[in-house]
């Protein structure tokens, strides 16, 4: 199964693509969709949707795993939630099934406890994907963690 993991954001959307065929997980791709701070929020959303469409066309994921947020308090958080909405809409347009996970569930699935530190989750991602170097940037590593959680929780 090919899984696209997504760590939503307005400035940077982390993505990670894994393949789970053959009984092992392996990383196919990871990176970020970057938007320019000088652009309007609307233009930034267009960039996210356009780049995500390209990723979906290139990798043809059978499942998308998206980090889910629960608290919306600041204007920055609202922008992230709006970007997440663009991600969800784009996935729906391509008929990619979606599973969502809050950060604590991702940490629990990878590190064994919901309050794990970022480096503990990164270590688990590297172990599960048999990586010698940590995926960079952090948003891409987070997206791989989300993708792995999608696989473990299926």
Swiss-Prot record:
One of its GO terms (molecular function) is magnesium ion binding. It is an enzyme of class 3 (hydrolase). SUPFAM superfamilies: Ribonuclease H-like. GO terms for biological process: DNA recombination; DNA repair. The active site is at residues 7, 67, 139. Mg(2+) 1 binds at residues 7, 139. It comes from the Bacteria. Keywords: Cytoplasm, DNA damage, DNA recombination, DNA repair, DNA-binding, Endonuclease, Hydrolase, Magnesium, Metal-binding, Nuclease. Its EC number is 3.1.21.10. Its cofactor is Mg(2+). One of its GO terms (cellular component) is Holliday junction resolvase complex. InterPro entries: RNaseH-like_sf, RNaseH_sf, X-over_junc_endoDNase_Mg_BS, X-over_junc_endoDNase_RuvC. It catalyses: Endonucleolytic cleavage at a junction such as a reciprocal single-stranded crossover between two homologous DNA duplexes (Holliday junction). Binds 2 Mg(2+) ion per subunit. It is found in: Cytoplasm. Homodimer which binds Holliday junction (HJ) DNA. The HJ becomes 2-fold symmetrical on binding to RuvC with unstacked arms; it has a different conformation from HJ DNA in complex with RuvA. In the full resolvosome a probable DNA-RuvA(4)-RuvB(12)-RuvC(2) complex forms which resolves the HJ. The RuvA-RuvB-RuvC complex processes Holliday junction (HJ) DNA during genetic recombination and DNA repair. Endonuclease that resolves HJ intermediates. Cleaves cruciform DNA by making single-stranded nicks across the HJ at symmetrical positions within the homologous arms, yielding a 5'-phosphate and a 3'-hydroxyl group; requires a central core of homology in the junction. The consensus cleavage sequence is 5'-(A/T)TT(C/G)-3'. Cleavage occurs on the 3'-side of the TT dinucleotide at the point of strand exchange. Belongs to the RuvC family. PANTHER family: CROSSOVER JUNCTION ENDODEOXYRIBONUCLEASE RUVC. This is Crossover junction endodeoxyribonuclease RuvC. It comes from Synechococcus sp. (strain CC9902). The lineage of its organism: Bacteria, Bacillati, Cyanobacteriota, Cyanophyceae, Synechococcales.
């Amino acid at each position: 199964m090919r899984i696209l993991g997504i760590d939503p954001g307005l400035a940077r959307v982390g993505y990670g693509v894994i393949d789970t065929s053959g009984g092992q997980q392996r990383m196919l791709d990871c990176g970020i969709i970057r938007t320019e701070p000088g652009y309007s929020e609307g233009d930034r959303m267009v960039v996210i949707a356009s780049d995500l469409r390209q990723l979906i066309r290139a990798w043809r994921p059978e499942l998308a795993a998206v980090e889910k947020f629960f608290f919306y308090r600041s204007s920055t958080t609202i922008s992230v939630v709006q970007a997440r909405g663009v991600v969800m809409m784009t996935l729906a347009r391509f008929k990619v099934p979606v599973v969502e996970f809050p950060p604590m569930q991702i940490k629990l699935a990878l590190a064994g406890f919901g309050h794990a530190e970022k480096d503990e989750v990164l270590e688990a991602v590297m172990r599960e994907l048999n990586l010698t170097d940590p995926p960079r940037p952090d948003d891409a590593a987070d997206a791989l963690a989300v993708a792995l959680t999608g696989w473990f929780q299926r």
